[in-house]
Each structure stands twice: as structure tokens, then as C-alpha cells.
Swiss-Prot record:
Its cofactor is Mg(2+). It is an enzyme of class 2 (transferase). Mg(2+) 2 binds at residues 224-225. This is Anthranilate phosphoribosyltransferase.
């Protein structure tokens, strides 16, 4: 099937969901050759992925992941990465704050690919045992409302595309698929994308995949988070109701900063910054974390505004609950 699919893609023809399913099965089982995978991913990227193509591919990747037993509605704050911003680990810190608010968060991530410090690198530098057994992580999620799912542990079939992705060196379908394949089956997602063109399509993909509520976001300074240094494009849905809008930092009382004000560094640097933020340090790095954590609290809650979500996130830091949550996370994963 993959050869026929490549022939369609080079003619700029879309694949049906069934065709994408068949091609992904060939890729995820190691049946397709490296040359075929490279040609397919390049041709698909050049054509542009449709909602149906991404949905079908994500379903196959989910089917091939290691199972994680979870029966709770969980939130994930995640991004496609590859934005080149080398910022602090915003979504990681927001996840800790949101979980301290009593909202279950299953953070799914990996080591750095294009940045200096990925989610896994930051948590490890903070002292979290990132590769705890799935059953242990499931229990931690139940006990303290947060867990970390180390992507390479749960997606063994990704080994069939890792080399090809590095060698062709362009963004491909798999930059989008990874964040769509949380093994805990996140039913709520604050989902950052690397392109404005993906904001609305990815919201519909999440809806197709059974997500109950989500916000897909793109910071207009090319960041896959809600930005403090630019406006942010948003597509939100709760149930079947979709709405698109723009977030401005000033709308929530924040002062717009320069993009470089949000820069991080190596894992040890980002871990130190993370502790400072959770201990109540002020400044743009804390503000951008509050903006994203507040949006996530708003998304996962009923009857509150985003501004109220941000104030709740601020109070969680001020009360010491966020710092305490990190310490519990470290302690529980190292038992």
C-alpha cells in the first residue's frame, strides 16, 4: 500500500482514512523500507496533512503503544515541539501546578530533540524518576494527580521511524502524532502546535479521537505554548462546540516580554529555574507559566473564566502547594 500512497501524494491527492491506516500499519510493524518511509513522509509533508489523515494515523500509533491502565479523565499539557525557542519547560511546570489544583495530569514526553532540555530531561534533573514502571505511575496518578509517561518506554514501534526522521531532517507527520498518542488517553488537552495553519485542524483531530475538551494553541512568535511575548491563536472546544479566538497577555494583566526573556538552558539550568518559579519568584518566566497553567485549569473546570484559572494558579504557587506537589512527585517516583 505504501507505494500506491506515495504515488497519490506526489500528485497532491489526499489519502482516505483506510489508506492511511494501511500505510501506518506497514510502517509501525517494520514492513516498509527506510526509502519508502522517507518518500512517504516527505511527500505527505509537501502535500499537507488532512484532518482525516492525521486522525487515522494517530489511531494506529495509539493501537501500537504499550497500555497504561487509567480510568480517570486526565488532562495533558503538551506541544508538538520543534519551535526552536529553547524556552524554559513551560508545560512541565504548568502540569505540576494544575495537578496541585486537584486536576489529574498525565504528562507524556521525551528527551530533547531540537531544544536543550525536554520534559524528561527537566523532570530527571529535578529528581523525578522518569522511567518508573507503568503500574507504579498509574498508582502515583491516582494518589497525587500527576504522572509522567516516558514516550520511548510506551512507543516501541517508533523505533521504525526514528532513523528516517533524523536523516530527512524536516518536520513530518510524526511531529504531530507523538503528542496525540498519550498512553493514558487524555480526555482534556492544552495542545501547542508549531504552525498557525494547524490550530483549527488539530482541534478537530482531537475531537475525532474522543477528546472531551481541548484548546489548540499557537504563539504568534512561533512558540507552541500560550505566549507572553506575542498574541496566541486558539481553537477551543468543550463537547461539540468549537470557538476560535486570540489571547493577548495584557488581557490578563501581564506585561508583554521579549521572547528571549523566556529562554532556558541545559537541564540543570531549567531545573533551577523551575524550583525558583514554584517557590514564588516573580518575572516573565513565572508569568508565562501562570498563563498556561491558568488556561489549563479553566479548560478542565466548569463555570470559571480563564482569568479565574490564572488567579487559582497564582494562589497555588503562593500557598506553597506547587512546591509541595513537586516534592511529592519526586518522593513517590523514587519509592
Amino acid at each position: 500500500m505504501i507505494k500506491e500512497a506515495i504515488a497519490k501524494l506526489v500528485k497532491k491527492e489526499d489519502l482516505t482514512a483506510g489508506q492511511m491506516n494501511d500505510v501506518m500499519e506497514e510502517i509501525m510493524t517494520g514492513e516498509a523500507t527506510d526509502a519508502q518511509k522517507a518518500a512517504f513522509l516527505t511527500a505527505l509533508a509537501a502535500k499537507g496533512e488532512t484532518i482525516d489523515e492525521i486522525t487515522a494515523a494517530a489511531r494506529v500509533l495509539r493501537a501500537h503503544c504499550e497500555k497504561f491502565l487509567n480510568d480517570m479523565d486526565v488532562l495533558e499539557i503538551v506541544g508538538t515541539g520543534g519551535d526552536g525557542s529553547n524556552s524554559i519547560n513551560i508545560s512541565t511546570l504548568a502540569s505540576i501546578i494544575v495537578s496541585a489544583a486537584g486536576i489529574p495530569v498525565a504528562k507524556h514526553g521525551n528527551r530533547a530533540a531540537s531544544s536543550k532540555c525536554g520534559t524528561a530531561d527537566c523532570l530527571e534533573a529535578l529528581g523525578v524518576k522518569i522511567d518508573a514502571a507503568p503500574a507504579r505511575m498509574a498508582q502515583i496518578l491516582k494518589d497525587i494527580n500527576i504522572c509522567f509517561l516516558f514516550a520511548q518506554k510506551y512507543h516501541p514501534a517508533m523505533r521504525f521511524v526514528g532513523g528516517v526522521r533524523k536523516e530527512i531532517g524536516i518536520r513530518t507527520l510524526f511531529n504531530i502524532l507523538g503528542p496525540l498518542a498519550n498512553p493514558a488517553g487524555a480526555s482534556m488537552q492544552l495542545f501547542g502546535v508549531y504552525s498557525e495553519e494547524l490550530v483549527e485542524p488539530l482541534a478537530h483531530v482531537l475531537h475525532n479521537l474522543g477528546c472531551k475538551r481541548a484548546m489548540t494553541i499557537y504563539g504568534m512568535d512561533s512558540i507552541d505554548e500560550i505566549s507572553l511575548s506575542a498574541d496566541t491563536k486558539v481553537c477551543e472546544f468543550k463537547g461539540d462546540e468549537f470557538k476560535s479566538y486570540t489571547i493577548k497577555p495584557e488581557d490578563f494583566g501581564f506585561t508583554r516580554c521579549k521572547k528571549e526573556d523566556l529562554a532556558g538552558g541545559e537541564p540543570a539550568v531549567n531545573a533551577r529555574i523551575a524550583r525558583d518559579i514554584l517557590e514564588g519568584a516573580e518575572g516573565p518566566k513565572t508569568d508565562v507559566v501562570l498563563l498556561n497553567a491558568g488556561a489549563a485549569i479553566y479548560l478542565a473546570s466548569d463555570g470559571i473564566t480563564m482569568k479565574e484559572g490564572i488567579e487559582k494558579a497564582r494562589e497555588i504557587i503562593k500557598s506553597g502547594a506547587a512546591k509541595k506537589q513537586l516534592e511529592r512527585f519526586i518522593e513517590e517516583t523514587n519509592k
